[in-house]
């Protein structure tokens, strides 16, 4: 599901779950093990990438179906809390986490990308939070990260208008640090990883800690409000109908 390759102080983690690399418990488990390994090796940089056409297409449809069952509100809240914990751990680890993003980074997949310290996107990447279309909200404190990184106006475009944007526009809005074309993305990302890894490990750890320390309290408050909103939405008929319609469309695609 995730292969590992170490290059001196760089740990390269390549996701290979399915074409969309959708998130379920097994992928979260694998990502947590990767973070454990980065801690064990005291890696300076964790380079997260995909061998599939897409970085991460969001929640797995099997998990979404689970949210519509009789105890679905509890299941959704549990999934959201677990994803939030994973994303917060990515922020908290002293290792610099760098996402190389090609293809889709949607919903929780965008949340995963935004939790990383550094991002490089291909020009053809597709970025968005389509959850509102089906009566939900993006999980894992994604709304706050999106607003912090791109500003309120851009966040409104993605969240309220439901815009799906390409990598070039995401880069213009401040959601990626670097932009590359599809053919050179892997090479360009490797070069950035090597450049970062040459920095002082001690200075990088302290720089990361200071960058995130100021907003930690407000992030915790937002996570609580987010969980309350999920519970309300998944218990309401209109969002449930939209989710059901989405699952039917996905099933019909084969």
Regions found by a protein language model. Give the residues of each.
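C-terminal alpha-helix plus adjacent terminal tail
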Residues: 1-8, 38, 162-167, 187, ...
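Crotonase-fold acyl-CoA enzyme core
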Residues: 88-201
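A general structural signal for well-ordered alpha-helical segments in protein cores
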Residues: 28, 48, 61, 83, ...
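Terminal peptide-recognition signature
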Residues: 13, 31, 48, 60, ...
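Residue-level signal for tight coil/turn positions that link beta-strands
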Residues: 7-8, 52, 94, 183
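Short strand->helix junction
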Residues: 20-21, 54, 136, 178
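Glycine- (often His-adjacent) and acidic-residue-rich active-site loop
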Residues: 50-86, 105
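Conserved CoA-thioester-binding segment of acyl-CoA-metabolizing enzymes
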Residues: 1-51, 88
């Amino acid at each position: 599901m995730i292969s590992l390759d170490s290059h001196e102080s760089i740990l390269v983690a390549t996701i290979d779950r399915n074409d969309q690399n959708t998130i379920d418990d097994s992928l979260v488990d694998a990502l947590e093990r990767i973070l454990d390994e980065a801690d064990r090796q005291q890696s300076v940089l964790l380079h997260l990438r995909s061998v599939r056409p897409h970085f991460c297409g969001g929640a797995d449809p099997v998990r979404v179906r689970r949210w519509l069952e009789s105890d679905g509100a509890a299941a959704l809240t549990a999934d959201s809390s677990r994803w939030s914990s994973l994303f917060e751990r990515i922020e908290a680890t002293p290792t610099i986490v760098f996402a190389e993003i090609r293809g889709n980074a949607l919903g929780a997949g965008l949340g995963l990308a935004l939790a990383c310290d550094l991002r490089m996107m291909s020009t053809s990447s597709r970025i968005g939070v389509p959850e509102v279309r089906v009566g939900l909200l993006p999980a894992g404190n994604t709304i706050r990260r999106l607003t912090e990184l791109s500003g309120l106006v851009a966040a409104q475009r993605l969240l309220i208008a439901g815009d799906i944007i390409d990598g070039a526009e995401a880069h213009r809005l401040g959601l990626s640090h670097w932009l590359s074309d599809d053919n050179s993305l892997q090479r360009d990302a490797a070069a950035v990883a090597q450049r970062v890894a040459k920095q002082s490990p001690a200075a990088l750890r302290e720089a990361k800690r200071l960058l995130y320390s100021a907003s930690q309290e407000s992030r915790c408050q937002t996570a609580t409000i987010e969980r309350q909103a999920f519970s309300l939405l998944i218990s309401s008929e209109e969002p449930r109908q939209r989710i059901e319609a989405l699952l039917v469309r996905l099933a019909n695609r084969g």
